[in-house]
């Protein structure tokens, strides 16, 4: 592939937008996952300060990648119950921005039906929170809406906004 590759400040490789856009979906997702997970771990504060210079696309991908990491490891409760999440109130709008509308609808319906307030950081006891709501049911429903669409949708969105992704592009 043509285009430049640079070493980022965290020790990983950066590619430019031209090279990124030539990647297959699988390659793009592997690149996105490794760079965002690295960034998420590096900037574990997860506050609005994290995004002070970020584009709308950067923030949306970061939030969905953060959710994906929790969800794929232990289900949706891992995201919402593990001390809450600073950006939980932005999750479904970020999903919609990227194009994961069915998953966003599923989560919004779950929150509404269970009268859950994730608009602030929750100091939660994971075990207590997990037993309050039917998380297994939403995990099953998300398996058909999020799991099947997330990687392709994230890759497509990232490619169409590659020039705005300052944290993973150079």
Annotated model-derived regions:
Residues 10-88, 94-170:
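Extended, alpha-helix-rich binding/interface surfaces that flank or overlap catalytic cores
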